[in-house]
Amino acid sequence: MYKRQGKARIAREGKDLTIVAHSYMVLEAIRCADVLKVKGVSIEVLDLRSIRPLDTDAILNSVKKTGRLLVADNGWVHFGVSAEIISIVTENIFDRLLCAPERIGMNNSPSPSTRALANNFYPRAKDLAKIVCKILKKKVDLEALFPKSSLSQDIPDPAFNGPF
């Protein structure tokens, strides 16, 4: 099935905060949004679908609506997609932001070569939720909401069918 590149889609509607994600991080962002919804947190998840061309209009429109931004990057945060998205937002609609944008991605270290090292390398929905709660100044028991997964951190969710 062909999807038009350069056109993002809203994977979840929300009003409190925008999570911009691409590739595998879309699944983690959706999981975060769905879990925090039970605590009254309304998260808009924007699935970029492609990073080149980048749908800057969709990003800016979503952040204008929510006033808050978290970029979930499936790469390193330094010099990556998340840095560029935050630059675009702050250069264009800085006055619409209610707080500083945040980003999450892989730890600033080499890719892990063992499962033990992988556990602290790949961001998961719970990691996104921790940042969302910080941004929104919400106290939520994340341990209760996100039970420990039986999957190793270096094994993607079975619902994902892209490269990992």
Identify what each model region corresponds to:
Residues 3-164:
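Thiamine diphosphate
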